[in-house]
């Protein structure tokens, strides 16, 4: 994936000429605001129609006089900018290196309702860390697979973070039944990485390690991942303790109770080790965040950026603008004000 960022900048080849601009406030003050100067100057004026004999008040005369000469001052200032040699620089930053393709496999079985992380259940805390994880990997395509008794692709690999987060928020425990088919979830993730052309392809599994309804053996998963050169990183969430369980179903029904599991991460360890990934055992907030951060470091791609700069001189445009301003000045001074220079 190539990202293109364009930046436009206005630069000057001879910037010292810009110091001439400081004299214009002095000229304007001397001609129009200094006592007994421009504010008191009399000049002939005539109006069209039946108003030729109408005598305007001094302040209206002075206002029209200043308004007319403002075009002359603007024209002169634009000429100074033209002398300074203005140019537009278009800087293009092209990311040549492609991002990684990552599929997150998320357990949404009932045991993920165990409350042990900052008063949140395992699923809600996992969602929170996933959001932080994807926000740090701007150039990566990231997908999401959820599994329980069944498994399903929730988000195809994409760079659309808003869409990803929306679908992530819409996941509920037991959406896919009461069970834990880890092998099926990983197999679906692998099928979506099969035709990926990314330099790095990996899967991140977040589960409490309880597998009780799987139709796909771990050896099948390992062989498929090895054949596709996909690394599988596993984050085992849990321990062999009793936890309170709190979660809400999509229907709005709320479950609350206790849960004791037999935590056995051996399957996760074997899958990760044989596919070139790593296994992380998580039992508190700190270790959970460390696992995500460590994965980000190991699967980080070195970014190659090409910078192309295109300069275009625009002094001619400034001269045209100055000419137009002078033309307006002469129209006002010669036709509307009937001033004789």
UniProtKB/Swiss-Prot annotation:
Taxonomic lineage from the root: Bacteria, Pseudomonadati, Spirochaetota, Spirochaetia, Spirochaetales
This protein's UniProt keywords: Cell membrane, Membrane, Transmembrane, Transmembrane helix
Name of the protein this chain belongs to: Uncharacterized protein BB_0173
Organism: Borreliella burgdorferi (strain ATCC 35210 / DSM 4680 / CIP 102532 / B31) (Borrelia burgdorferi)
GO cellular component: plasma membrane
Bilayer topology: Multi-pass membrane protein
TM region positions: 8-28, 63-83, 171-191, 317-337
Protein localization: Cell membrane
Domain VWFA: from-to ranges: 101-305
InterPro entries per record: UPF0353/GerABKA_families, vWA_BatA_type, VWF_A, vWFA_dom_sf
């Amino acid at each position: 994936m190539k990202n293109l960022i364009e930046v436009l900048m206005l630069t000057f080849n001879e910037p010292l000429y810009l110091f001439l601009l400081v004299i214009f406030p002095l000229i304007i003050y001397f001609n129009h605001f200094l006592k007994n100067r421009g504010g008191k100057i009399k000049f002939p004026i005539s109006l069209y129609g039946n108003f030729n004999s109408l005598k305007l008040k001094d302040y209206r005369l002075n206002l029209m006089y200043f308004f007319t000469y403002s075009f002359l001052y603007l024209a002169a200032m634009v000429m100074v900018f033209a002398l300074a040699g203005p140019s537009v620089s278009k800087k293009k930053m092209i990311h040549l290196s492609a991002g990684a393709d990552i599929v997150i496999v998320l357990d949404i079985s009932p045991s993920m309702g165990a409350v042990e992380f900052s008063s949140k259940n395992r699923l809600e805390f996992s969602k929170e860390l996933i959001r932080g994880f994807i926000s740090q990997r701007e150039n990566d395509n990231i997908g999401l697979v959820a599994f329980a008794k069944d498994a399903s692709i929730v988000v195809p690999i994409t760079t659309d973070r808003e869409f990803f987060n929306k679908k992530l928020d819409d996941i509920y425990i037991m959406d896919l039944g009461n069970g834990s088919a880890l092998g099926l979830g990983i197999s679906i993730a692998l099928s979506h990485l099969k035709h990926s052309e990314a330099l790095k392809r990996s899967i991140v599994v977040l589960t409490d390690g309880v597998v009780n309804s799987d139709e796909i053996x771990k050896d099948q998963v390992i062989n498929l991942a090895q054949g596709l050169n996909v690394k599988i990183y596993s984050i085992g969430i849990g321990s062999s303790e009793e936890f309170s369980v709190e979660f809400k179903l999509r229907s709005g029904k709320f479950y609350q109770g206790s849960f004791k599991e037999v935590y056995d991460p051996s399957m996760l360890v074997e899958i990760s080790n044989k596919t070139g990934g790593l296994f992380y055992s998580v039992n508190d907030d700190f270790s959970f965040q460390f696992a995500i951060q460590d994965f980000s470091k190991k699967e980080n791609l070195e970014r190659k950026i090409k910078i192309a700069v295109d300069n275009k001189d625009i002094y001619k445009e400034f001269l045209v603008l100055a000419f137009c301003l002078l033309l307006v000045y002469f129209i006002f001074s010669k036709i509307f004000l009937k001033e004789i220079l």
